[in-house]
Amino acid sequence: MADSEADKPLRKISAAFKKLAIIVNSPNPEVPVTQFSHACSLVSPLFGCLGIAFKFAEMDYVAKVDDLVRASSSISTLVVMMDKDIEADCVRKAGSHTRNLLRVKRGLDMVKVLFEQIIASEGDNSLKDPATKSYAQVFAPHHGWAIRKAVSLGMYALPTRAHLLNMLKEDEAAAKIHMQSYVNSSAPLITYLDNLFLSKQLGIDW
């Protein structure tokens, strides 16, 4: 059924991140790698919907999430995963689970800011401002000139707001509800991840 709940990405994302928010808001949060990586994988199609401007972000995000999905078969929680990398002295090495987690966290943050901007720009059919602001705030500080230039050019090929909602199989009212739900749920999760990196003195700007 084309209109079934399972066929609507925003609803699946909203439900998955609500569950993660409950975990990170608990007194002793332990986030399972399996649950986290599954929720993150549900976000992947959103990057594809944004077209060429976010092609690099999509490829990078999907690859990092896939690594965490594989890691989940043998590692229980995000804390255990980070501790293993710290013990192996490979945190900052390309391909490490912890490094990939930081990249995935930025992807989640970018989508959060994008949704905030889309909600705030209700009535505007262009996604250029929301996409530009979310990219500038989250990704641009970590990208070189060539990638930033390619993204800037790609902004002119973004789908319209109406086309995006059509791809996500939602009307304006429902999309706003589920986008706001993700914003509300992802905020404590992103804070939890930032604090996790900082508590282990790894930093978050690398």
Swiss-Prot record:
GO biological process, one term: defense response to bacterium
Predominant subcellular localization, coarse grouping: cytoplasm
Effect of residue 99 to A/E: Severe reduction in C1P transfer
Top-level division of the source organism's lineage: Eukaryota
GO MF terms, alphabetically ordered: lipid binding; sphingomyelin transfer activity
InterPro entries: GLTP_sf, Glycolipid_transfer_prot_dom
Name of the protein in its database record: Accelerated cell death 11
